């Protein structure tokens, strides 16, 4: 049968990445409290394509994922990238896992349990030698505006904000470390289940710790800079303003 993909390209330009996108896959992620947890990832996977080839072999990406160990860690991602490179005879391979990570969280006053989900992403790239890995985690938090509190006779405006952390690590770290780091930086964490006693606690605690978006990004960056296992980070905080029809944001990026 004719192999059209291996025929010469009519436009001799190399393609940085070509592959399959938005493929859903069961995933097992390391969990600090329980050892591991099952979740579902949306996977993008691809390779570099030389200028001389017309196309890549899309089915081989799916075959590689079908044979892959579902545990997400450095060893298994390295193995997957090596397998993809071999199957596609490629110089460089790239994979991107997006998945929700769940943490059981007790309400601060009543202890009522609830699951909070966090959007996470792990990206791996392999060219020659050791693969490069990057972790992304998005953490919802609450902020209370210090200016609004200072100038108002009663109350202050508050809102949900998103702390987005991207980082490269020298060694294994728990996802919980960076989630807790983000929550410590804001006026308050957010919760799934709150009874009246909990709402009172969260409101009063948040108003006792007002934070600008600038305060949150600096507090998070300070902790990431001090983390011994982080070699590079970027942290962005987006405040979904409750009294404006726009968001506020702040970002810090640093190589260590």
Curated annotation (Swiss-Prot):
<dbReference type="GO" id="GO:0046654">
    <property type="term" value="P:tetrahydrofolate biosynthetic process"/>
</dbReference>
<dbReference type="GO" id="GO:0003934">
    <property type="term" value="F:GTP cyclohydrolase I activity"/>
</dbReference>
<feature type="site" description="May be catalytically important">
    <location>
        <position position="145"/>
    </location>
</feature>
<dbReference type="Pfam" id="PF02649">
    <property type="entry name" value="GCHY-1"/>
</dbReference>
<comment type="similarity">
    <text>Belongs to the GTP cyclohydrolase IV family.</text>
</comment>
<protein>
    <recommendedName>
        <fullName>GTP cyclohydrolase FolE2</fullName>
        <ecNumber>3.5.4.16</ecNumber>
    </recommendedName>
</protein>
<comment type="function">
    <text>Converts GTP to 7,8-dihydroneopterin triphosphate.</text>
</comment>
<comment type="pathway">
    <text>Cofactor biosynthesis; 7,8-dihydroneopterin triphosphate biosynthesis; 7,8-dihydroneopterin triphosphate from GTP: step 1/1.</text>
</comment>
<dbReference type="InterPro" id="IPR003801">
    <property type="entry name" value="GTP_cyclohydrolase_FolE2/MptA"/>
</dbReference>
<keyword id="KW-0378">Hydrolase</keyword>
<dbReference type="InterPro" id="IPR022838">
    <property type="entry name" value="GTP_cyclohydrolase_FolE2"/>
</dbReference>
């Amino acid at each position: 049968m004719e192999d059209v993909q291996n025929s010469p390209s009519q436009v001799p330009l190399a393609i940085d990445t070509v592959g399959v996108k938005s493929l859903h896959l069961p995933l097992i992620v390391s969990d600090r409290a329980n050892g591991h947890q099952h979740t579902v990832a949306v996977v993008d996977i691809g390779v570099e394509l030389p200028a001389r080839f017309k196309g890549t072999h899309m089915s081989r990406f799916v075959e590689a994922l079908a044979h892959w160990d579902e545990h997400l860690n450095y060893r298994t991602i390295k193995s997957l990238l090596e397998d993809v490179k071999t199957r596609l005879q490629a110089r460089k391979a790239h994979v991107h896992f997006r998945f929700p990570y769940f943490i059981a969280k007790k309400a601060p006053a009543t202890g009522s349990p609830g699951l909070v989900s966090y959007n996470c992403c792990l990206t791996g790239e392999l060219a020659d030698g050791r693969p490069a890995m990057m972790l992304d985690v998005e953490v919802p938090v609450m902020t209370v505006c210090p200016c609004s509190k200072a100038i108002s006779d009663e109350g202050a405006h508050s809102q949900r904000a998103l702390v987005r952390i991207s980082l490269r690590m020298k060694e294994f770290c728990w996802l919980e470390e960076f989630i807790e780091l983000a929550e410590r930086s804001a006026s308050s964490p957010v919760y799934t289940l709150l009874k009246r006693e909990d709402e009172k606690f969260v409101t009063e605690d948040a108003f006792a710790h007002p934070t600008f978006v600038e305060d949150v990004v600096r507090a998070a960056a300070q902790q990431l800079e001090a983390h011994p296992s982080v070699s590079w980070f970027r942290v962005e905080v987006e405040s979904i303003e409750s009294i404006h029809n726009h968001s506020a944001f702040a970002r810090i990026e640093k190589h260590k």
